[in-house]
Amino acid sequence: MGRRARDRRRQLQPQQRRERSGGGGGGGDDQAGWAGGYPEIVKENELFERYYREQRIVPDGEWDAFMAALREPLPATLRITGYKSHAREILHCLKEKYFRELQHLEVDGQKVEMPQALSWYPEELAWHTNLSRKILRKSPQLERFHQFLVSETECGNISRQEAVSMIPPLLLNVNPDHKILDMCAAPGSKTAQLIEMLHADMNVPFPKGFVIANDVDNKRCYLLVHQAKRLNSPCIMVVNHDASSIPNLQVDVDGRKETLFYDRILCDVPCSGDGTMRKNIDVWKKWTTQNSLQLHGLQLRIATRGVEQLAEGGRMVYSTCSLNPIENEAVIASLLEKSQGALELADVSSELPGLKRMPGITKWKVMLKDGQWFEEWKDVPSNRQTQIRPTMFPIKEEEKLKAMNLERCIRILPHHQNTGGFFVAVLIKKSPMPWNKRQPKVHQKLPGKTEDTEVTATNAGDGSEDATEKPTLAEDEEPKKVQELQNSDTEQSKKGVCGPPPSKKMKLFGFKEDPFVFLPEDDPLFLPIQKFYALDPSFPKMNLLTRTQEGKKRQLYMVSKELRNVLLNNSEKMKVINTGIKVWSRNSDGEQFGCAFRLAQEGIYTLYPFIHARIVNVCIEDVKILLTQENPFLSKFSSETQRKVKDMAMGSIVLKYEPDPEKPDDLQCPIVLCGWQGKTSLRAFVPKNERLHYLRMMGVEVFKAKRKEGESEGKTEEEVQCRPAQTEEGMDVEDKERDAVTKMEAEIDEESPRSPVESSAMEIENKSEDSDQCSKNTNSHINQESKDMNTNNVKD
């Protein structure tokens, strides 16, 4: 398209938009809401109603209520991050400030409905509200509430997540020492829940467990990284594989290679998504039975691969946002049948009291999109047997069916608690799967082994094909295969490098990622850091890594010991997108301040227990100064703070606030900030949204009134009063990159199966301009170190 054509198109677009918004609904300005100007989708689907009436998933007498609920908009739901020490402060702030402001508020003559806590979610940490975006824009109090939600979401203190999607992680019963696999993890709200559970004890910086979050879609993996990074955990790894063929991983156990089996697996598979009709209204016109018939095979393959990698005694949760028994009970029944007693459905009826649920069904039928029904496989004509498979039908033998206990499955119906539709099944693995009885394990000690020279071994279940269709590897082929992989991997492992696969034959799909290079024990880079910050001897320096093999190391990241083990032993198999949290960044002025590396805020809660020097305890008034002023002079701080920093060398410091129990009106949770002491000043290196979070918790008003048309470009009084300081040279770049990820987040719905964006009050209001550009931006957001060697800007 030429320049003139583009100009003409731009001139026409505003007029076309005005014409569209004035027509159709006949409401003109009244219709210019979130979906203003577009023809309203009729929420009717005769085939849908016929199908589910026949399947009898809805109790007698409740059909009208069920359909009425599906036609109502879905309430927006938020979840307060539970493991952070200030979760109670956020809850207190929500209830005592923002909710109280809404108590007697009226908009357009109608009383605003108060947000309600989810009765079944622990400790009142999840809430839902019917406030729409249109209403949020009509009142300053509501606008403040919206800004609070958006900012806290960006910090990771609040997650926007559909209510029913919170159920699977809760039913996993995660402990901090569990090894967890999230098979289809993007966009990452359930993954965030799992990370929270690992860090249940905030006094343990490195829990023994970890989360490996996988997704088949490369772009969605970067959205997953963005979600996970908000929680600042060293125990999360994001990988990019097809879940139905995700490879077996190896770990070093006392010098031997052993297959990694997971204690917990979340198997939230792709689905037709008819449980999301309340938010994804396109489903009304697009729904057919063909969707479930096409997905059934993939869902069964993913679930099968999951139970293969589950440890004996482990728990796997299978879930979909579909109501269809072909995607739900049929998959579970087929999996139980071929497991030959190795799996059983767990009885979770006593878990999550307050959650209204329906039991799984034992009888269902299969329908084609033309409305033709089949009750048994034998009734299916040969020309239809490519669309319909035997595993889609219920088990006919009554004894076998009864032993499966399919009624232990959970189906959530929308009209019971004003939610979306959902299905959950909890599986326990009692013994190895029948087709994995001869699964080989390598217990071969490597010659001349050191901690950094582990190599990768492989076995039958490395995921190249579905294990039920491929026989296990013959035992006499093992030594040869192991030797081949030793030869290819040992050189990089010796250097502590986990990078892209070196051989073309083993190369994985997708983009080339920067390597993960662990610092060797004798690396001269670490000694000045250890001395400057007086690090505890127990500090696990072997877990430090960088993302470049050459040139100056500009960022230092950290992972847990267990994830280090996984990384070093699987560089040939895994496509790792991201892992670790940033703990140190190189100073732009080099070593003139005693140490070349300053502390990074995202890793400070992990590092703090090991730091014994350069810690300054500050009062709450000092914290307010640090967070509201750009580079305040030392004279502005309390005399006690001035005294503490007077004789301290310039450079990076830790600023610690401890609550005073005798002052209950002050903030009652501890705060740890990264700071910088200059010759005459003291500043905080804290991202903007995190600053706003702490200020809100301290009762400082940080609301920014939106400028109306025609207003000057000057700052509002509130913006000037509480303007967060620009903390780093690279902060502008950080904000732009976060905006790019946020735009992608607006494109990809938080909890739907690869579906349109959810219209909730908490969603950040950005539209994506170009998803390919977003992918490029977010890729650089994660893998910047080796690509930006010539800049001193700080990037995440």
From Swiss-Prot:
Residues 1-36, 435-501, 707-796 are annotated as: Disordered. It is found in: Nucleus, Nucleolus; Cytoplasm; Mitochondrion; Cytoplasm, Cytoskeleton, Spindle. It comes from the Eukaryota. The active site is at C321 (nucleophile). It catalyses: cytidine(48) in tRNA + S-adenosyl-L-methionine = 5-methylcytidine(48) in tRNA + S-adenosyl-L-homocysteine + H(+); cytidine(49) in tRNA + S-adenosyl-L-methionine = 5-methylcytidine(49) in tRNA + S-adenosyl-L-homocysteine + H(+); cytidine(50) in tRNA + S-adenosyl-L-methionine = 5-methylcytidine(50) in tRNA + S-adenosyl-L-homocysteine + H(+); cytidine(34) in tRNA precursor + S-adenosyl-L-methionine = 5-methylcytidine(34) in tRNA precursor + S-adenosyl-L-homocysteine + H(+). Belongs to the class I-like SAM-binding methyltransferase superfamily. RsmB/NOP family. TRM4 subfamily. RNA cytosine C(5)-methyltransferase that methylates cytosine to 5-methylcytosine (m5C) in various RNAs, such as tRNAs, mRNAs and some long non-coding RNAs (lncRNAs). Involved in various processes, such as epidermal stem cell differentiation, testis differentiation and maternal to zygotic transition during early development: acts by increasing protein synthesis; cytosine C(5)-methylation promoting tRNA stability and preventing mRNA decay. This is RNA cytosine-C(5)-methyltransferase NSUN2. It comes from Gallus gallus.
